[in-house]
Amino acid sequence: MNTREVELRGHIIDSLILPRALDIIMDMGGDFQILEIDIGKRKSDPSHARILVEAETPSLLNQILDELGEIGASIAEIKEAELRRAPMDRVLPDDFYSTTNHQTFIYHGGEWVEVEGIEMDCMIVVDPESRTARCKPIREIKKGDLVVVGREGIKVVPPERPRGKQGVFEFMGSEVSSEKPLVTTIKKIASEITEIKKRGGRIGLVGGPAIVHTGSAPVIAEMIRLGFIDVLFAGNALATHDIECALYGTSLGVDIDRGEAVSRGHRHHINAINEINRAGSIRDAVEQGVLTSGIMYECVKNDVPFVLAGSIRDDGPLPDVITDVMEAQNEMRKYVQDLDMVIMIATMLHSIATGNILPSRVKTICVDINPATVTKLSDRGSSQAVSVVTDVGAFIPILLHEIKKMNGLGD
């Protein structure tokens, strides 16, 4: 029998980490012995468990240890993290370690070193001179980089669920469902947003064109103007239709106020792109007085950065759209590590793309009328996301109303 001792520390009972660990061992065909367990008696007390993991083969044992590592289990006997040099650009050494989106440490030089820029599905590269470790995607690996391999000397710390009330993240902790009280949910989200902003935190918005189609662009624009959005991630579509709405009062040629298609309205979004091209950029259009309202206008006027990532289906695109997806991803990376919350609204593509580079400590709200969007986001590793399955046209105005009420801003 092949064995290895692992440890779990923290709120392992409340966060269900201990039962998940035991389930993993048994479901994968292993066995276990609990060697020691110390359960915290007060709300602030962490718990600790030592577990002997048993498996029939070394290969199975390693597979179990890999799965346990992803939920925060660490090998009990501390050894230095093993490093090997990358043999070529964009080529990894065998048995490389692939990161989760949880806070991660490696044991290097006799001390635990936190991995900087953590995100899922990346490699840990160590700089021996500065004694630092940071995440790198495979495309950024250079020949000679010292890459962490194996399982030794790696500690993963998932977000814990402390005892006590946790606002919307406790309330919404069940499966994806539309059968949840919408207004109550929105009030809790508004409360979280208010608390984050009061302590100087930062909030990102990931938005799809349905925001404009449902007539909610002025509401998001007001949220930006009031300082509740600190960065915007979107695609060509949201920006194009927002500008179309600002210039012509339509979205995809449909009058926003009357809900009716207008004559030759199918040209409006191309007209909008043409006007921005003529001005030079979205910022130029604002400064020249061409664009005087809307989401993109408020971003420019309030110095809120935006990243517009292109896709293969884009019309135009607008000159501000980054058509190289790797470049767009790197631009998004500049902002995600400093965020405290991300609100994802009606865009499966950009929500999942953002989720892939978000640390798990960032509170994440995903709003979509399609339950598959929030399910796919969670399935792809963004387990910290909570879902609101509803029409964004109903969600956004109520959210702003509650935020303004909580902050004494009137209506």
From Swiss-Prot:
Looking at the keywords, is Transmembrane helix present?
no
Whether NAD counts among this entry's keywords is yes
Recorded catalytic reaction(s): these are: L-ornithine = L-proline + NH4(+)
Query: What species is this protein from?
Result: Methanothermobacter thermautotrophicus (strain ATCC 29096 / DSM 1053 / JCM 10044 / NBRC 100330 / Delta H)
Q: What are the protein's UniProt keywords? A: Lyase, NAD, Nucleotide-binding
Give the record's family classification: Belongs to the AgrE/ArgZ ornithine cyclodeaminase family.
**Residues bound to NAD(+):** 236-237, 315, 347-350, 368, 391-392
Q: Which cofactor does it need?
A: NAD(+)
Its annotated function is as follows: Catalyzes the conversion of ornithine to proline, with the release of ammonia.
* InterPro entries, per the entry: ArgZ/ArgE-like, ArgZ/ArgE-like_C_1st, ArgZ/ArgE-like_C_2nd, DHS-like_NAD/FAD-binding_dom, LOR/SDH_bifunc_enz_cons_dom
Q: Which NCBIfam families match?
A: TIGR00300 family protein (TIGR00300)
What top-level class of enzyme does the UniProt entry assign? lyase
Protein's name according to its UniProt entry: Ornithine cyclodeaminase
Q: Which residues form a coiled coil?
A: none
State the organism's lineage. Archaea, Methanobacteriati, Methanobacteriota, Methanomada group, Methanobacteria
**What's its EC?**
4.3.1.12
